[in-house]
Amino acid sequence: GTCQMGYGGSVTINGGTVKATAKGNGFGIGGARIYNTGAMTVTINEGTIEATANRNNAAIGDKGKGESGVTINGGVIHAVGKGGAAGIGSKGDIRITDGELTVSAEGSGAAIGGFTDSYSERVDCESITINGDVIKSISSKDGACIGAATGGSVGSITISDAELPLLSSNKILIGWDADSPGGKLTIRNCRVASTDTLSVLTDGIRVGSNSELVIEESEIRLPHLRGIRVGGNGSIAVRDSDLHTYGIFMDENAKSPNDAKTLKRLEITDSTVLTGDIIGARGEYSSVEEIVIRGSIIRLNDEYTYNRCTIGGGEKASFGSIDIQDSQIDSRSSVNAVIGNGTQSQSYGESLIRIANSQVSVRNELFGPAIGAAYGSSGGQINILIENSTVTAKGGNLRSGTDYIPGIGKNSSGRASEIGKIQILNSTVESFRLEEKDGTNYVYDKLHTKELPGIPAENITICGSTVNGKTIDHSFDEYGKCTLCDKYDLGYCYEHGLLTLEGLTDCAHDGSEKKLTGLSHQTGENETKQLTENTDYTASYSNNVAPYTLTPEDEGFDPAKAPKVTLYGTGNYCGKAEHYFTISE
């Protein structure tokens, strides 16, 4: 093999065996202690490498004032950082695409990422890119396994197509916790797990303020007390993934309203989440603008002794909207609403809870409703919309013998929290309250008779639904508009030939998904409205690729195999319609 020293401090290793130890304040392999003004890069293409940094900087790395970076394209590499050193570190870009790496940091440095330099100054990494199953073992103490040194940040981290089954750290596993001007952490098509046993709440995957965290097509297994967390003004997106985590949240615990922080957006799409704590904002004065849950399953991890999960804002804070569609939620909470805001929340605007096309079972264990305004909250207006769903909600224990806590809404005692409108459309809802203080006997509350604390009867709409065993049907005109809820019902419109579906006739198999190209509704004798997806309706498909030529009228028709589109009303539309179609050979 060869080892080349380039002008300005660049190092390239193409093979052989290299053992390097920095006993003082230098790098094991890479930049010198007195930092060069030119380019200082390290490239490893092959070889067997053992490198150690005993005090600071990195076992493999650099800190040039010009171009700076570490690139690893192969090799069997063992890198150890001690003191403030990283195992592999750089001021610039770290890119790892191949090889077999065993990396550790035994002090404040990251195993891969940031470190402390010879002048005791923290060095933050611009970017870290890891592609492929290259990490065989990685551990750290007070810095991250992959990310920043203690108190530092990273510009961006991208980890893809990787197996990381044995992460171990006293602090963060992946990411950083410092305030930052804006960074992004992306984990895509990975399996991430940790074997740590913890006694206190510790961040698992974390980014600081003003940053974005994205998890896609991945399996994340974090041990008890490790969560997925962002800082203030951050956002989280989880897509097509399977997560076991203590929670998914912003946790800021501000001391006063002047220090209040906000989670901008939390999205969970087509994922399964097994959790034991908050999904949304956690702590005092911690608000959330938007929570979007689509096609996902969220339930409690029975292994957790503290086993309560809320979806929404933190204490003394607020939320903008919680939109749950095509999902399954099974959870319980204490004091905070399971779906809604935290205790003593203060809001000055309107908030929306929407549950559509979903199955929800939630229970509050203390003082508040399961869905709506938590105990002690005040101001603002929470609107609740339930459509095409099955919901069971149980209110919490009473504060006194005269208290009344419904499953959905607000409790009768405490501050004058506001519930605006409750709309229940095309759904089956059971809303329970405890009959007496410290009791165990649940009975239906009076949602079905529209007699809930602090909510005028005219603000409660129930249509095409069964609530607490009482069925209230729609009342349609000839074009499918209900005179009670003032919405058009897609089911009625479809059954009476008022809908025209485009793009699903004469479909031929070509390997592509067959979907609607248009949907229109006859709203009058000579009037037709073109409907807009995600405004008037949403659509879900099944079996819409493979050939299938039987219709519901044909002998041998199998609905489990037939191409189908299911339309769900939203906005000015409600209800659902199912349409089977054929795909020719």
Please give the residue ranges for each predicted region.
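Substrate-binding N-lobe of the ribokinase-like
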Residues: A144
